Amino acid sequence: TARARQIPALAKVMTGELADSVLQGELFLRRDGHVQQQAGGMNARAKVAGLMMRADAAAALSQLDVFIWAWPDGPSDMRRRQKLLAQAGFKYSGQYTHPVSSIEQVAQWRQRWYRSPLPFVSDGVIVREGREPPGRVWSPGKGEWLAAWKYPPASRVMQVRAIRFSTGRSGRLNVVAELEPQRLDDKRVQRVNVGSVSRWQMLDIGVGDQLQISLAGQGIPRVDAVVWRTAERHKPTPPPAKFNALTCYFATPECSEQFLSRLIWLSSKSALNVDGVGENLWRVIQQQNPMTHIFSWLALTVEQLQAVPGISAARGQHLWHQFDLVRKRPFIRWVLAMGIPVPQGALAQLESENWHLLAAKSEAQWRTLPGVGEIRARQLVAFLHHPDVVALAQWLSGQRIPGF
């Protein structure tokens, strides 16, 4: 990209064996003696992304460098590969790549880099075999010839301020512990999802208790342990469970939480992948333009979106454009957005289906799909014939959504 060409650390021209090569790596923010164990992540990746998006960042881009961690179809000899990369200006890969022959050696390097000054922020080590498959068969997340070994997660003892209950998109009651806010690595943590009511009761968490909190994948806080409990227990009574996987497709006052959870899900990457739309935006849209059902936003006009508090004219136009683009998503994405209980392994076999074909399937036909047993087949038939789901399918048909 044009912005990448402004980064001084990136060579403008590659010659020799590197000419026309594809390199894989990551931009990083140069640090002076960064000790991961002490300083944590420092939100470094977000800072890099911010610099790459700034219009006036030409000078600041000199703070960036690149770590090349793969050269598909490059020289098979690792020493020669690292030498060629270093000659081209990619010095860090060679400095931080070492041969190992045992898990003990891997552990030693991991501990050393975790506790020693480095010129960048890191979150673990990559262990890879000496040989790699041809580049044409590489697939993200599916390389059996390499593995990541993350550093121990940062953790803190944090006190519980309150316990509250929320309803997820499946209708299940979730327990959230509100915490005294603290910095954990590069994040400000003030709440943690405990999980189901049964898990909360098993952990016996009350107001005033102290929890060991760490960051799981993607920086999500998690409860590792209860380290101290108050002598006098303060635990609220959970509300009665009155929602399920087929409730709250339509908005009502008592459905507000599950309805919002459904909106958050359908806009996520796992469903319709609506760019730039999340929980906060759904809240303000629902307050300004109350939606009847989970797909009512498709009928919003540019003017209605621009009238939402906090949304500028330009952003309103952009949102309307994103909503309009979603109309072209494949049929399977729409039924996922509705919450169809299909196992991941069976999705590929539904890509050529439409709503009428799905609704016509019997329990016996559903059981022929991977991962679908007697209970799941019964759930699928119930889902496809539920009056609210049928009404949504009819509405989407009126909107000319593919497959309906």
Protein language model features and the residues they cover:
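Extended, well-ordered alpha-helical scaffold/bundle regions in very large, multi-domain proteins
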Residues: 357-365
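Extracellular/lumenal glycan-associated surfaces
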Residues: 346, 353-355
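RNA/tRNA-interacting regions in translation and RNA-turnover enzymes
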Residues: 1-329, 336-342, 351, 366-399, ...
